[in-house]
């Protein structure tokens, strides 16, 4: 028996060649819809950073594989800096799966439906991949080096188990006997060089460990790790000249600058136009994703209205001056997925448009801003940005931690953390602006905290007054409160001068 779809009904026929030939023609237009219903709807990959899991567990993936050939055309050792929650980890995970010689035969299964599946490069499946995620390292001041050794040694053990067949019993015995991470690494590097094994080093959150140290333990401890014979600096010196290709990603340029004298072969592509849209979602990406879930009858509502709703909150990131008039602005990945998940699960937009999980990112940034306490100049920078929404500045590609207190570099730090983005030019300088409401609220919250530290104000009482004015028309108490506070905090001269 054959079943044909027509006008929402299923029709049964024993002879599709005779009476139902016309249905055979009409059904062709419905094949994509039928196939979509036959397949399991893809899950939303919120918070998932493992590319193989996304593919194998039937989760939605926004294809970024077209950037792999562009990266291959760059120098062999690269750095890229992007704000938190912009898809760095899953991109690096995708790269690992693509170049891993241990997954060479998985290419069609993992990448067959992606852009690179039809455009494979000669480097696909040719590397042994060594990966580190330094966000997993932390601890007390006394335990930092020990924890670093434990984590890195564990990753090397995973590497040796994965590529077991490439190394002889003798080499594996040497590896096991090596007492430290550096010694184990040297065993691998020596044998790989001797045997001409191509090695690819991929480091996620290369700056996270040191940023945490800077925040929690201060500049002196940070300086000890990243200068002279500091163990973190020494690790990067081991990487120098020993890997065929290297890609490192992070959220700030601070560690990059402090380590470059020991690791001076990295090429910073953070502001290169070719990679402006490599991380994050374009509006086209978002529309295609929303359309997919609408076609699956998971997402209700008008897509244009949804885009209009989320753009002021999650969009408008630009990381390259050359991209201003040629590339689309970029959405924050996790924010879009947060909205989509809420919209599908609840049937309406989230009451709070800001993902609560981003509060941890804000807390990290706030601690970094408060190093040595904000001086007057830097407070003025934040106040000006909060009030005017933009500032004209030169963008520094990197700078050492000791220069964090320099107000001229402060705007660059805000840019790399995603608190400012490129919105225009003025002469040879950039106009950096607040990208969206999500970030704008973080500025206001920060300013409010600073004011609260000076004089505590009951915000709940203020909210009650404004709510009574807005919802009940009871405006007198709110106006009296404003007039009283103005009188208490203003001088006669302020009135004379018109302030």
Kindly give the residue locations of the regions a language model identified:
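N-terminal pre-Walker A segment at the start of P-loop NTPase domains
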Residues: 43-69
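Pre-Walker A (Motif I) flank of P-loop NTPase domains
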Residues: 74-78
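Conserved lysine of the Walker
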Residues: 88
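P-loop NTPase motor core
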Residues: 104, 108-158
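Substrate-engagement module of ASCE P-loop NTPases
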Residues: 188-192, 222-244
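Structural recognition of the conserved hydrophobic beta-strand(s) that form the central parallel beta-sheet
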Residues: 202, 245-251
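Amphipathic alpha-helical segments of the small helical/lid subdomains adjacent to P-loop NTPase cores
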Residues: 255-262, 269-341, 381
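Extended alpha-helical interface modules used as scaffolds for assembling large macromolecular complexes
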Residues: 266, 329-499
């Amino acid at each position: 028996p054959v079943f044909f779809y027509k006008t929402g009904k299923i029709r049964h026929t024993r002879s599709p060649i005779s009476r139902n030939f016309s249905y055979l023609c009409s059904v062709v237009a419905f094949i994509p819809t039928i196939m979509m219903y036959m397949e399991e709807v893809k899950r939303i990959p919120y918070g998932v950073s493992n590319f193989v899991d996304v593919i194998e567990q039937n989760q939605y993936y926004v294809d970024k594989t077209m950037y792999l050939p562009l990266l291959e055309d760059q120098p062999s050792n690269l750095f890229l800096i992007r704000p938190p929650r912009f898809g760095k980890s899953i991109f690096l995970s995708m790269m690992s799966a693509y170049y891993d010689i241990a997954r060479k035969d998985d290419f069609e299964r993992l990448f067959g439906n992606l852009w690179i599946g039809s455009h494979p490069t000669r480097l696909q499946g040719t590397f042994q991949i060594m990966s580190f995620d330094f966000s997993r390292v932390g601890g007390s001041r006394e335990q930092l080096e020990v924890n670093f050794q434990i984590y890195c040694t564990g990753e090397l053990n995973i590497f040796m188990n994965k590529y077991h067949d490439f190394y002889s019993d003798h080499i594996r015995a040497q590896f096991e006997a090596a007492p430290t991470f550096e010694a184990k690494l040297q065993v691998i590097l020596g044998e790989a060089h001797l045997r001409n094994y191509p090695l690819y080093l991929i480091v996620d959150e290369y700056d996270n460990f040191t940023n945490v140290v800077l925040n929690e333990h201060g500049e002196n401890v940070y300086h000890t790790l990243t200068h002279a014979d500091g163990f973190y600096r020494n690790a990067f010196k081991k990487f120098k000249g020993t890997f065929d290709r290297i890609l490192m990603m992070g959220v700030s340029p601070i560690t990059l600058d402090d380590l470059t004298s020991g690791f001076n072969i990295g090429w910073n592509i953070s502001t290169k136009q070719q990679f402006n849209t490599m991380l994050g979602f374009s509006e086209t990406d978002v529309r295609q994703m929303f359309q997919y879930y609408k076609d699956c009858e998971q997402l209700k509502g008008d897509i244009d209205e949804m885009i209009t709703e989320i753009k002021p909150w999650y969009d408008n990131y630009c990381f390259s001056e050359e991209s201003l008039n040629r590339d689309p602005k970029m959405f924050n990945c996790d924010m879009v997925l947060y909205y989509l998940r809420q919209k599908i699960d609840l049937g309406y937009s989230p009451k709070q448009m800001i993902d609560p999980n981003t509060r941890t990112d804000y807390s990290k940034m706030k601690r970094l801003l408060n190093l040595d306490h904000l001086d007057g100049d830097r407070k003025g920078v934040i106040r000006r940005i909060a009030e005017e929404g933009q500032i004209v500045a030169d963008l520094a590609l990197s700078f050492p931690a000791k220069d964090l207190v320099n107000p001229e570099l402060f705007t660059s730090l805000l840019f790399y953390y995603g608190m400012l983005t490129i919105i225009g030019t003025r002469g040879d300088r950039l106009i950096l602006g607040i990208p969206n409401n999500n970030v704008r609220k973080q500025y206001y919250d920060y300013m409010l905290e600073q004011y609260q530290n000076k004089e505590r104000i009951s915000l709940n009482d203020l909210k009650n007054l404004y709510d009574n004015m807005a919802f009940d028309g009871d405006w007198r108490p709110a106006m009296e409160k404003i007039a009283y506070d103005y009188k208490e905090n203003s001088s006669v001269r302020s009135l004379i001068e018109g302030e």
